[in-house]
C-alpha cells in the first residue's frame, strides 16, 4: 500500500494467506521467531473460541457459521495487535490466516488496512494433495485450491519459503522488505540507501561504499566501530541491505562481533539474490585474493524481495543471469532458468542503478518462481555440505577459480557476473582438454551466456596462462594443487584437483 506521495505506508502486521496446506502456519511460526515478533494462528484461535476442532465446527454448525466465528476472531486478533497510537515504527506480529479467511471483503479490507497480506505460492497439485492426505479430515475445504485460484492470484504480494542449512529461513517474494526492515538495525549499500531508504521508511545506521574494491578488512573494522556506537549486544540482530559485498561484509562483521550476533540478509541485486544471499559464506578480500578472510555464518533469515530489481540496469540483470546459468549447469538444463532473456523494462541502458521504475520482476525478465527454483539448486547442495567439508559444495565453485583470477587481474573492472560467464566457458574448455567433456560443449555453454548478453572470452590482452599465478592463491588450494569445479555438461559438474605447479591447463 502506498500513500499519495508514492511512499510505502508502514505496516503493523504481516498476514500470511494462501490455499489450505500451503504452509501458512509453518512459515508464520518460523518468520515470527526469526524476527522476534508475536505469532497468531487464526485457526488455533477459532478452535479455542469454539471449544471444538474446525472439522467439528463444519460438521455440526456448517460453513456459514464457521465464517462468522472466523470473522469475529480476526477482528479480535487485529484489535489486540494494533496499538492505540496513530503510528508505529515497526511490524508487531505475524498472523497466519485460514485458507478462506479473506473471501469476505470486510476481512480482506481489515487486514490490508492494518498490515500487509502475503499470499504463499501454492505448491504443485501433487504436493498439495500429499500434504492434505497426510492428515485426512483436518481440512474440510482442502480441495478448494483450484476453485479459488483467481482469488489467491488477486493478492499482489507473493511469497515462497524454504530452509537453507542450519535453519536459515529463505523467503522469496514481492513487497515483503518494508515489513521486515521497519525498526531494525540496517546496514546499507550507499547506492541502495540513496534509492530505497526514503521509500522504505528506514534510516541505516551504517553505510557501505558500493563496489568490490571496498570489500576490505578496513571496511569490516568500520562496521565493528558502527556496531559499537550503535550499542549492539549479543542478543541484537543486524540487517544487511544491498548486494553481495554488503552481505559478505555485514555477515562477517556479525560473525566476529562479540563472537557472533545474528543477522538478516536482504539482497538487492539479482546476482546476490541467486548466489551470495544463501550458503552462509561471509568475508572480505585480501591483497592475495578474494574472500581469504571469512567465516561460515548463516543468516537466520534471508529476504529476497523482487521489487528491488526495479532499479537494476540490464547489465546488472545479466550479471545475475550468469550465476543462474551456472546453477543450471549444476542442476541440469532448465533448472530454474529460462532459455533466453525476456526484454528488460528498466530505466537505464548503461547505468548501474536508476530510480524505482514500478516494473515488476516478470516485466524485468525474471520471475519470483524462477528465482526460488534456481536457488533450490544451490540450497540443495548447501544442505548436504554446509561447511564445505564433504566435497559436495565445491560444485558451486563452477567457473569461479578462473573468474576470481580475471577479477583480480583486471582490478575488478570486469564485473563478477561477467567473470563467472567467462570463467565457466574457460573451465569448460579445460574439461574438454582433459577428456571430460565433448568438444562441442564449450560452444554450447557459451551460447547460453551469450543469450543473456554476457561475454564468453577472456578480456583483451589476457591469456589463461597469465592467470595461473593468481589461481595458485585460490582459497581452495591444497599445496600447489587447486580444486576446480569443471562444467562437463548440463547437470555434470566435477571436482578436479589440478597441480598448477606441474600441470598445464
Stretches with model-predicted labels:
Residues 252-333:
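A glycine/threonine-rich phosphate-anchoring loop and its flanking beta-alpha core
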Residues 6-9, 34, 116, 149-169:
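NTP-dependent small-molecule kinase module
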Residues 363-465:
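Active-site segments that bind and position negatively charged phosphate/pyrophosphate groups
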Residues 164-237:
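ATP/NTP phosphate-donor binding region
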Residues 25:
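Walker A/P-loop
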Residues 44-84, 88-112, 142:
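ATP-dependent small-molecule kinase phosphotransfer cores
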Residues 322-325, 436-505:
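C-terminal charged capping/lid subdomain of soluble metabolic enzymes
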Residues 56, 113-155:
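A glycine- and Lys/Arg-enriched "phosphate-lid" helix/loop adjacent to the NTP-binding pocket
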